[in-house]
């Protein structure tokens, strides 16, 4: 049986993810929460521009209607 999108996101809990926003911003951090509206909570969040960290945050909440994509990240 095919997985549903929220099942894939659930498997990413407590793992590093990359969140792409509609305005072109990218955040990387540990996914510690989400809901059915794709509001996400990241711990140790970082703002990424051109592949480089430009600002570090602690815990942040990103409103779901700003999210374009959410992807697991494998850190080296």
From Swiss-Prot:
InterPro entries: Lsm6/sSmF, LSM_dom_sf, Sm, Sm_dom_euk/arc, snRNP_Sm-like_arc. PROSITE patterns: SM. One of its GO terms (biological process) is mRNA splicing, via spliceosome. GO terms for molecular function: RNA binding. Keywords: Ribonucleoprotein. GO terms for cellular component: ribonucleoprotein complex; Sm-like protein family complex. NCBIfam families: PRK00737.1. PANTHER family: SMALL NUCLEAR RIBONUCLEOPROTEIN F, SMALL NUCLEAR RIBONUCLEOPROTEIN F SNRNP-F. Belongs to the snRNP Sm proteins family. This is Putative snRNP Sm-like protein. It comes from Thermococcus kodakarensis (strain ATCC BAA-918 / JCM 12380 / KOD1).
């Amino acid at each position: 049986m095919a997985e549903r999108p929220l099942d894939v996101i659930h498997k990413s809990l407590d793992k590093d993810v990359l969140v792409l926003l509609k305005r072109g911003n990218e955040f990387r951090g540990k996914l510690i929460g989400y809901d059915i509206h794709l509001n996400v909570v990241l711990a140790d969040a970082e703002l990424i521009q051109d592949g480089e960290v430009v600002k570090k945050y602690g815990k942040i909440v990103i409103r779901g209607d700003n999210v374009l994509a959410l992807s697991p990240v494998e850190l080296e």
